[in-house]
């Protein structure tokens, strides 16, 4: 098999670009399990990256038809070894319009939907919210994403109910319950994450979202009964898929469920006449950026993918074993990955037979922009960029504009963004910012020829 070799010397060159001068290794404690986290480029072991354009049996990808087969081979590897098998499509998809009104100072039509997955409307339900530019003359593209603590946090609109049920705790929640206090908080310019609805509408895009906690809960590794990770995490839409077979090592995971929900959101978009669902953008920040990337890798209907600040398990190379790594992932986030992934933790550089550049490649030839966050070394922006470089030949092979061949770009440097594939990073706080939204929409405009 043709491979791409990344040596310690290459890592040292990349280290010269990083803004973090300190060299250190820290220890995280996950319920008594001590896990080392490396933040020292010089400690990264040499590793080998598999070539996305070479089959497991050594055959070269020679045509677009070959690539379609190779893509399925790669997705099967990730299903069996990391993210778990892909959830099945639901037996039914009921999308009930709850209400509709003119909003956003008259510039949008806002609709709320309840989505059920059984014909009798029993079982799990996801609440989707949608804004459509009111004055558009033809169907518009749509940006879809999952939010963290409820649709009511996106805008100041009293008609949007506060998220009920379990919610990931935050400084403005009531423990694991969402709060009226968080209504519209993503309209606050000082928030780590914002939702610039007015800008999105003015750029000619619809926007849709749902709360990921309604898909399936996301308890922390240290949560106590009845919310402990090993059982409570597999509720919500997991109820659709029957009892888990714990003898399997490739069961459906939380990341797989959240990605599945994004595809169901696209199902809804396809039913809305004012939306051109063939021009869809999927995004998300942090763990929801991981979910967006997985959704686009699996579902070719997503035309543009812009995962934001994914951290380990998303865009960065796992074999670097830097920042958020396989060992932290399998102990802190046991429900995000299938049990087969555990075996790679002792030595990812030697044991892994795949890496995240291959997942990025599964989006090709569609448009992919990786947005990084440089303030925290946990996010490993160098690893993101190396993954992009290793995936770039696939876009070139398929005849699409690939990522420009430029040195590792500094924060806010747009030189690594191509027409169909690119990379950009920034500093400041962890969250999806105005910069991130602007870069996303500019990239989507180029992809759609706007």
Model-derived regions: residue spans:
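N-terminal pre-domain segments of enzymes
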Residues: 22-86, 443
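Cap/lid segment of the alpha/beta-hydrolase catalytic domain
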Residues: 145-264, 268-271, 314, 318-320
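C-terminal catalytic histidine-bearing segment of alpha/beta-hydrolase fold enzymes
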Residues: 332, 336, 389-450
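Bacterial N-terminal signal peptides
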Residues: 7-16
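Conserved strand-to-loop "acid loop" that flanks and positions the catalytic carboxylate
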Residues: 364-379, 426-428
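Mobile cap/lid helix-loop segments that gate and shape the active-site cleft of serine hydrolases
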Residues: 237, 304-359, 384-407
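Primarily recognizes the serine-hydrolase "nucleophile elbow" in alpha/beta-hydrolase
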Residues: 257, 263-325, 348
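Short beta-strand element of the alpha/beta-hydrolase
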Residues: 127-129, 138-148
């Amino acid at each position: 098999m043709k491979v791409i070799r990344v040596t310690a010397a290459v890592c040292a060159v990349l280290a010269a670009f990083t803004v973090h001068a300190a060299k250190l290794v820290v220890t995280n404690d996950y319920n008594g399990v001590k896990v080392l986290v490396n933040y020292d480029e010089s400690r990264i072991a040499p590793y080998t990256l598999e070539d996305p354009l070479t089959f497991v049996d050594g055959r070269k990808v020679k045509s677009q038809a070959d690539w379609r087969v190779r893509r399925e081979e790669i997705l099967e590897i990730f299903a069996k070894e990391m993210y778990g098998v892909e959830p099945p499509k639901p037996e039914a998809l009921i999308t009930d319009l709850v209400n509709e009104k003119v909003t956003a100072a008259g510039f949008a039509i806002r609709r709320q939907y309840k989505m059920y997955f059984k014909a009798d409307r029993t079982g799990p339900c996801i609440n989707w919210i949608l804004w459509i530019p009111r004055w558009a003359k033809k169907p518009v593209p749509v940006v879809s994403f999952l939010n963290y603590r409820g649709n009511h946090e996106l805008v100041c609109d009293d008609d949007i109910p506060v998220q009920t049920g379990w919610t990931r705790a935050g400084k403005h929640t009531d423990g694991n319950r969402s709060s009226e206090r968080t209504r519209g908080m993503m309209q606050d310019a000082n928030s780590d994450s914002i939702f610039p609805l007015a800008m999105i509408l003015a750029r000619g895009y619809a926007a849709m979202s749902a709360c990921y906690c309604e898909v399936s809960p996301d308890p922390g590794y240290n949560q106590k009964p009845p919310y402990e990770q090993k059982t409570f995490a597999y509720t919500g839409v997991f109820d659709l898929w029957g009892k888990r077979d714990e003898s399997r090592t490739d069961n459906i995971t939380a990341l797989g469920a959240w990605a599945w929900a994004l595809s169901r959101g696209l199902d809804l978009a396809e039913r809305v006449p004012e939306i051109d669902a063939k021009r869809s953008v999927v995004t998300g920040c942090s763990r929801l950026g991981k979910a967006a990337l997985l959704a686009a890798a699996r579902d070719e209907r997503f035309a543009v993918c812009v995962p934001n600040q994914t951290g380990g398990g998303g865009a960065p190379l796992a074999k670097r074993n830097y920042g958020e790594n396989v060992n932290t992932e399998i102990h802190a986030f046991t429900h995000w990955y299938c049990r087969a992934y555990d075996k790679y933790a002792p030595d990812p550089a030697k044991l892994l037979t795949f890496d995240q550049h291959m997942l990025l490649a599964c989006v090709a030839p569609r448009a992919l922009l990786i947005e990084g966050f440089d303030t925290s070394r946990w996010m490993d922006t160098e690893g993101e960029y190396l993954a992009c470089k290793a995936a770039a030949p696939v876009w070139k092979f398929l005849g699409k504009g690939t990522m420009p061949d430029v040195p590792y770009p500094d924060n806010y440097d747009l030189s690594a963004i191509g027409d169909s594939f690119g990379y950009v990073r920034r500093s400041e706080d962890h969250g999806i910012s105005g910069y991130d939204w602007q870069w996303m929409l500019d990239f989507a405009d180029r992809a759609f020829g706007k």
